[in-house]
Amino acid sequence: MNTIGLGNALVDVLLRLENDDVLSEIGIQKGAMDMINREQMIAIRTTLAGLPRTQTPGGSVCNTMRSMSSLGANSGFIGKIGDDSIGGFYEDALEKAGVSSYFIKTDGLTGSCTVMISPDGERT
């Protein structure tokens, strides 16, 4: 089967919290989803810089195309990435997953999603 998807190219940055206290410190409610600006993202990631982190390509369409590829289907992804290191990571990760990628590259930053994972597994 040949399938191509068009979607948002987002890199998921997963941070494992030692406890939930840090959420109060940075003013975020546990389990909430908030759209934040670049400055807020940098402040959060700076505050949590010492925590273990994992980076993975994300976005629902990309995740579906990667899953299809892992099941043996020919899949492709169309999206927009920035001309930055995170965009390069995204492109490389899709290639390694066997997903043909077709990107529009801009001078801006690649989109990202910061996910803080509490010890009980809840995502914020």
Question: How would you describe each model-predicted region?
Answer:
Residues 1-78:
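Glycine-rich phosphate/adenosyl-contacting loop at the front of the ribokinase-like
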